[in-house]
UniProtKB/Swiss-Prot annotation:
Record remark on domains: Contains an N-terminal zinc-binding domain, a central core domain that contains the primase activity, and a C-terminal DnaB-binding domain.
Function summary: RNA polymerase that catalyzes the synthesis of short RNA molecules used as primers for DNA polymerase during DNA replication.
Name by which UniProt lists this protein: DNA primase
The Toprim domain, residue ranges: 257-338
Classification via SUPFAM superfamilies: DNA primase core, Zinc beta-ribbon
Oligomer and partners: Monomer. Interacts with DnaB.
């Protein structure tokens, strides 16, 4: 049995490239030494999540979350320390027979996961080992659901009795857990199972925990109106957030950075049988922003494979608007069929071929979707051009614009190529004017303006590392994506960087130097008069100094484990700074000079306040004393 001491944990972490680990969950792009992606811990549209593979940590400049590989697994999978270590060991291919000396904190949702897991097991047993289950399996087999599919998706059967689950689980869980589980209805002091006489599809979260169910009616004599009934909203189940099959699809999505989006369970099952694994379903509900935010953490491309009927096409139209045209492709399922029906008519190979080669771009779908029925009317044609021309104008390729202009001309009986082209060009010009209202701007002038706005001041003296560029490189370039206008060639930041004062930037850079240069830390540890301006930096300095004194070195992982959440976030932010390896004495002097000046300014303002208090109190002796101090302090500024 292995005890999880520091040495064992650190040895395990050393075997793992943290960027490889996190890329299983988040789509990462390389930028210099680091990797960036959309933060999985808060909703964002612009990447601010940094991963440093060399030093083995991550840090989000948006929400401040940070840590090492184990901390990431704890946060992302909502598990305790031991489970995170086990997951990391599995990823590294290391076998650990763990005996944990630490007290695991209970996940507050663990009982809800467990009661739903046990219900899923009971439903599956009923399907696989009862006479009623045999009839239900025959029904499923006729619809292409084999025993292999039943096993993979843990499909089950709710019996006709309305108290089967209650009788089997009521003695194992308390009333509060049962009430919160979503498995029961309560009426007039009676308890009934929420699902009866239905094929049961367990709904799991992305970590594989059962969080709810969707029950499908299967018998002809079933008078219930709803084809599917879902678990009502609970603490652990939110239909606007969860996606069916995400736990099984996640590894392939993360690897390929592409996800197929479908409407229902049977569609996903058909795709699985066709050998396509990166497929999820929104369970019949409309796609939401929550769904998209989750998937964008793993995928860069979305392929919409919705039903071919009008409802499915309407859903595609709304999804394009939610996701953004540049990241979407559409598979139009012919003949108004859904993917499951298509696989039955044309075989699994036919479905696989359709999913891969039948993709079209959003603009092609929108031209067909928005095409009016009555194109004999001139005003209708004009309105159609007004709708489509901005979409064509946004296309980055002139060749693509030309192709879709020609497609419009084929549709419109009263318009020729040059007329439609003129409408598109006008839209393009209007877009350029809107994007760049100030004329005669070049890239350098905008960069200077942006720099001034965010107070990225350079050091007055010549330094080996430029203060402005060092901080800009880390806190701007690696956090932001930039939109480059083809017409003006102007780089525009897509988000605002959290502002730090010039002093705060200098303090962070000095702390970085102390962490990685023992001579710098030693120099300031021997200066009794040295202090940082801001308390959070002074507190961190004290703990860095203590780490060095006790252990005669600074171990980043160990130090991080000794810090509070707020201190740890600040620590990771500081060691994320991408500074040159060498540090000159002149650089250190200049950094200290920057925040020393602010310290002197603070002292000056405090003396002014004290003077006002003394004057108000009529203390002439104190007024004279403070006046002299203010004069002397003014000379230091």
């Amino acid at each position: 049995m292995v005890s999880l001491d520091t040495e064992v944990v650190n040895d395990l972490k050393s075997k793992v490239n943290i960027a490889d680990l996190i890329s299983q969950y988040v789509a990462l792009s390389r930028t210099g030494k680091n990797y960036i992606g959309l933060c999985p811990f808060h909703g964002e549209k612009t990447p601010s999540f940094n991963v440093n593979a060399e030093k083995g940590f991550y840090h989000c400049f948006g929400c401040g979350r940070s840590g090492d590989a184990i901390e990431f697994l704890k946060e992302y999978n909502q598990v305790g320390f031991v489970d995170a270590v086990k997951e990391l060991a599995d990823f590294a291919g290391v076998t650990l027979n763990i005996s944990d000396d630490r007290e695991e904190k209970n996940n507050p949702n663990a009982p809800l996961f467990e009661i739903n897991n046990q219900a899923a097991r009971l439903y599956n047993i009923l399907l696989m080992s009862t006479e009623l289950g045999e009839r239900a399996r025959k029904y499923l087999e006729e619809r292409g659901i084999t025993d292999d599919v039943i096993k993979r998706f843990n499909i089950g059967l709710a019996p006709e009795e309305n108290d089967f689950i209650f009788k089997n689980l009521s003695n194992k869980f308390d009333e509060e857990i049962m009430a919160k589980s979503g498995l029961f209805h309560f009426s007039n002091n009676n308890v009934f199972d929420a699902f009866t006489n239905r094929i049961m599809f367990p709904i799991t979260n992305e970590y594989g925990h059962t969080i709810g169910f969707s029950g499908r009616k299967w018998q002809e004599n079933d008078d219930s109106k709803a084809k599917y009934i879902n678990t009502s909203a609970t603490t652990i189940f939110d239909k606007s957030y969860e996606l069916w099959n995400l736990d099984k699809a996640k590894p392939t999505i993360s690897k390929q950075h592409e996800v197929y989006l479908m409407e229902g369970f049977m569609d996903v099952i058909a795709a699985y049988k066709a050998g396509i694994n990166n497929v999820v379903a929104s369970m019949g509900t409309a796609l939401t922003e929550k769904h998209i935010r989750r998937l964008k953490q793993m995928a860069k491309k979305f392929v919409l494979v919705y039903d071919g009927d009008s409802a499915g096409q309407n859903a595609i139209y709304k999804a394009i608007d939610l996701i953004g045209e540049s990241a979407v492709q559409i598979v139009k399922v012919p003949e108004g069929l859904d993917p499951d029906e298509y696989s039955k008519n044309y075989g699994l190979k036919g479905l696989s071929a359709l999913m891969e080669t039948g993709r079209i771009q959003p603009i092609e779908f929108l031209i067909d979707y928005l095409r009016p029925e009555n194109l004999a009317n001139l005003q209708t044609q004009l309105d159609f051009i007004e709708q489509i021309s901005p979409m064509i104008a946004k296309l980055p390729s002139i060749t693509a614009q030309d192709a879709y202009i020609r497609k419009l001309v084929e549709i419109l009986p009263d318009f020729e190529y040059n007329q439609v082209e003129q409408a598109v060009n006008l839209r393009r010009e209007n877009m350029t004017i809107t994007d760049h209202p100030v004329s005669n701007l070049d890239a350098s002038s905008l960069t200077e303006s942006f720099t001034d706005e965010n107070d990225y001041s350079s050091l007055e003296s010549v330094m080996p590392v430029d203060f402005e560029e060092a901080y800009y490189e880390n806190n701007v370039k690696t956090q932001q994506t930039y939109r480059r206008s083809e017409s003006a060639q102007v780089v525009q930041p897509s988000v605002q960087v959290p502002k730090l004062s010039r002093s705060e930037k200098a303090e962070e850079m000095l702390l970085h130097r102390m962490i990685y240069h023992s001579s710098v830390l030693k120099k300031f540890s021997q200066d009794e008069n040295f202090r940082f301006v801001h308390k959070r930096y002074q507190d961190l300095f004290d703990k860095i100094l203590l780490e060095a004194m006790v252990y005669e070195q600074i171990d980043e992982s160990h130090l991080a484990s000794e810090l509070s959440d707020e201190e740890r976030s600040l620590f990771y932010q500081i060691i994320s700074l991408d500074l040159p390896d060498t540090a000159s004495s002149q650089e250190i002097k200049d950094l200290v000079s920057i925040f020393s000046n602010e310290m002197e300014q603070i002292k000056f303002e405090e003396l002014i306040q004290q003077l006002a208090t003394a004057e108000k109190a009529g203390n002439k002796e104190r007024v004279l004393e403070l006046t002299l101090q203010i004069i002397n302090q003014k000379k230091k500024l």
